[in-house]
Amino acid sequence: MSAQDSIPYLQIRVDGICQVTPTHFTKTIQFRDINYQLSDNEDKQAIFDGWCDFLNYFDSSIKFQFSFVNLTALRESFARAIPLRSDQFESIQRELSKIIEVQQAKGNNGIVKTKYLTFGIDADNIRSAKPRLERIETDILNNFKRLGVSAEVLNGQERGPAPHAPSPPAAKPEPFTFRWEDLPRSGLSTKDYIAPSSFLFSRAKDFRMGKKFASVSFLQILAPELSDRILKDFLDIESNIVVNIHVQSVDQVSAIKTIKRTITDLDKSKIEEQKKAVRAGYDMDIIPSDLATYGAEAKKLLSDLQSRNQRMFLVTFLILNTADNKRQLDNNVFQTNSIAQKYNCQLTQLDYQQEEGMVSSLPLGLNQIEIQRGLTSSGVAIFVPFTTQELFQDSPEALYYGINAL
C-alpha cells in the first residue's frame, strides 16, 4: 500500500471538480478575511446574522466543510517573492527584506493562513453533477459577496495544493510544482504530487507523515454556550495546525418531527415520575432535575426551528497538529487542548482512527469520523471564521509593508 492510497479520491478535473467516490463530487472555494474582531458590537451582530443566513443556504443535499490551514512559510518562499534587482531601489529592497526577516523571527513566525470552503453533492455521474455544482458555486460566491468577503473558486491547477497543504511541513519542503499538461506523458496522477513520501499509522493517537509527527483530535462541545473567539484562539496558535469543520444540514421537517418525538418521550417520562411521586406520597411537582432541564431545552430548540429561522446541523470539529518531533507534537496538542478547556470543551485525540482523521482533514469534503454534535444555525455560526482583513500586496507594484492589527 502506497502513501497515495491513503488519499481516497478518484480524480481531480481541470475545472476543479473532485470525484471523491463514484457518486460524490466536490468543489473548493478559497475565501479571504474581513474585519470582525475589531468591529463594534453592532457591526459584529450584523456580520454574525449574515453568517447565519449564509449557513442556512445549505440544505440537506449539500455536505460542506470549512478548512483553516495555518502553515509556517519557508524562508526561501519569501526570498523568491522579492527577488533582488539591480536598480535605483536596491537599497530600499534590501531594507524591506531585512524587515521581513526580523518579523519572521517573531510575531506569527511567518505562518501563512488560508481558508477554504469545500461543498459536495451526490450524483450518478459527472455529467449530472457539474451543472448543479456550478449553480451552488454561483450562489455561494454571491452569498460571500453580500458579506463583503472576497472569494474565488479553485480550478484543478489551484486545487492541487489544497489537499497538498498538510504535506509540505510533513515531507515536502520544496515548493509545490504541478502542471496539468505533465500528467499524460509522465504517467503520474495528481496524487503523486499531493502525497508525502510516506504515512505510518502504527500508533493509536498519532502518526508519521514523511519525517514529521502528526495527530488528529476531535472537539467535544460540552459548553451550553460558546464564545465567538474560540475559532480565532485555535488559529492564533503559533504552530502548524489545520482546523476542519464538517457540516451536514438536517432536513427541516425531519428535524422538527424528531424534536417533537423527543418532547413527547420526555413528557411521558415526566408523567411516570409524577405517578411515582403520588404513590410514594410526596409532591408530584418534584421531578428529576435532568428531566426538567432536557424538556426545557427541547422546547426551546423546537421554538428556534419553527419561529427563529434556524436550521439543524450535524457538526464534526477536527484539529490536525503537526511537529518536527514527538515532544513538540505533544506540546502542540496540549496547547490546543488548553484552549478547548478554556471554553469548557474537551479535545480528544482520535484512538486508532488517525488515518480516517487525516483523510477528514483534507479539503476533499469527505468526513470519515462519525462523531457529530447537533447545533442550530447560530450554534454553527459561533465559529466565526473572520478576524481582521489582510492588508497584503503581492504584486510587483506593492507600495508599503505593514503589520495587521491582530
Regions found by a protein language model. Name each.
Residues M1-T388:
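Extended, folded cores of ATP/NTP-driven motor/assembly subunits in large transport
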